[in-house]
Amino acid sequence: MTAPSQVLKIRRPDDWHVHLRDGDMLKTVVPYTSEIYGRAIVMPNLASPITTVDAAIAYRQRILDAVPAGHDFTPLMTCYLTDSLDADELERGFHEGVFTAAKLYPANATTNSSHGVTSVDAIMPVLERMEKLGMPLLVHGEVTHADVDIFDREARFIDTVMEPLRQRLTTLKVVFEHITTKDAAQYVRDGNDYLAATITPQHLMFNRNDMLVGGIRPHLYCLPILKRNIHQQALRELVASGFTRAFLGTDSAPHSRHRKETSCGCAGCFNAPSALCSYAAVFEEMNALAHFEAFCSLNGPQFYGLPVNTGWVELVRDEQQVPENIALADDSLVPFLAGETVRWSVKK
C-alpha cells in the first residue's frame, strides 16, 4: 500500500469565480486570494454593477491597491450584462484587455442581481457579438420564476435557457458556473469544447443535510443552494474523473457576520482562506490527486486560452485550524469551515 503524499506541488492555481466586494470588505478579503492564486475572475455584482469599461478599470485599480506587497496577482475583470448593455462598450472593453468575460445573472437570482437579465432574448445582440469575439459568457444557471422550487432552479435552467441558447449560438464559449446538480454535471460532460463548468469546495464537501439537519448552519447557505447527496456525489465523481472542462471556481462570497447570522441571512460562503486545502481534501478522498493540479491550474487557462502560471504552490500534509472569525472594520467575517481542522496547508 502506497503511503499518502506528504507534499503536493502544483502550478500556481487560478480562481475562476470570486467575489471581492468593495471598500473595507475588499481590503480585508483580497489578500486571501492574491496570496495563493495567480489570477481570479472577479464578479461584477457590486451595489453599482460593473457595466462600463471605465467602471471596470476603476474597480481593478481598487483591487490592485488592496494586494499586499510581494503578491503577484492579476484580477480578471468581468462585465455585468443588463437588458440595456451597449454591445460596442463590451467589445471595446474586450479588445482593450479590460473585460475578460461577461456575466449573465438572471434578474434576482443572487446577491446584487436586481439589475440582471430578464430574458436571454433581451440581450441576444450582445451575445451574438460575444460569439464573434470569442468572449466567454459566464452564467449563473438558475431560473427565478416564483413557481419553480429553489432546489429545481438549476435543472430547469438547463432545459429552458441554457440548451436553447447553445443551440442558437453554437460557438459561444460558456462557463456554467458553480454547478450543483447531477443534471448539470451530466450536461457539461456531454457538451462540446465550448462548454465548461466551475465547482465550489462547499458543493463538493457538503449537501443540504449538512446545512439543515440538527440546526441551520447559515455559513453553508449559498446560491445555488446545496442540493441532496446524489448531486454532491455526481460533482465529486466529475472532478475525480479528470474531466478537463471543469475547473476551480471558489465563488468565495463574503458577508459580514451580522448579515449571515440573522433572521433573513445573505447567501454566500467566504471560503478563500481554506478553499485550496478543501479541494485537496476532496481529491484525496476520491483517490484522484493525480487530477488535482489540472483542476486547479491547467483546465481553466486551457478553456480561456490563457497561459498557465509560471509559479508553483506547495501544499503540505500539516493540519491547521481555520480561524473562528476574521476582523472586519466594525464587524467580523466567519470563514468557511470556521474553527474546523483541515489536513492540508499551503506552504508559506
Swiss-Prot record:
Its EC number is 3.5.2.3. Substrate binds at H19, L20, R21, N45, H140, L223, H255, A267. GO terms for molecular function: dihydroorotase activity; zinc ion binding. PROSITE patterns: DIHYDROOROTASE_1, DIHYDROOROTASE_2. Pathway: Pyrimidine metabolism; UMP biosynthesis via de novo pathway; (S)-dihydroorotate from bicarbonate: step 3/3. CDD domains: DHOase. The active site is at D251. Its cofactor is Zn(2+). Pfam families: Amidohydro_1. It is an enzyme of class 3 (hydrolase). GO terms for cellular component: cytosol. Binds 2 Zn(2+) ions per subunit. The modification N6-carboxylysine is found at K103. Zn(2+) 2 binds at K103, H140, H178. GO terms for biological process: 'de novo' pyrimidine nucleobase biosynthetic process; 'de novo' UMP biosynthetic process. It catalyses: (S)-dihydroorotate + H2O = N-carbamoyl-L-aspartate + H(+). Keywords: Hydrolase, Metal-binding, Pyrimidine biosynthesis, Zinc. Zn(2+) 1 binds at H17, H19, K103, D251. Belongs to the metallo-dependent hydrolases superfamily. DHOase family. Class II DHOase subfamily. Homodimer. Catalyzes the reversible cyclization of carbamoyl aspartate to dihydroorotate. PANTHER family: DIHYDROOROTASE. This is Dihydroorotase. It comes from Salmonella paratyphi B (strain ATCC BAA-1250 / SPB7).
